[in-house]
Amino acid sequence: AKGVAKDVGSVPDAISQAIQLTGVDTSWGPYMKLLLQAESGGNPMARNPIWVNYRTGQQASGGRPGPGWYQATGLYQMMEPTFRSYAAPGHDDIYNPLDNTIASINYIKSRYGHPANIPRLGQPGYRGY
């Protein structure tokens, strides 16, 4: 999903605030900007039209097929269960730029260590993180 954030100023602020709140190095900033452009185009309200079964990875379009199916949502296109697992206390709104950025940073730390390690980020063939 591509779009433009309704409050463009809030997105860079969210990145710098999330970096401070999570304690990661400022070197994360450019990568987080690159990642949000690839994932949502900077639109905190973005929702991928494809439903994904969180357990099997199976995909479907149209309406929600049933329990356990989610859409990638928000700036960093997180699935709801992943967002909940990595959200910070008090930052539980998947559509809030700061909350989504914090959860994304926490997920990236856990899975990749640093966003520089996300395969093909910023290159042709990038397929999501």
Give, region by region, the residue ranges found by the protein language model.
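Intrinsically disordered, low-complexity extracellular "stalk/linker" tracts enriched in Gly/Pro/Ser/Thr
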Residues: 1-8
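Peptidoglycan cell-wall recognition and remodeling modules
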Residues: 8-129
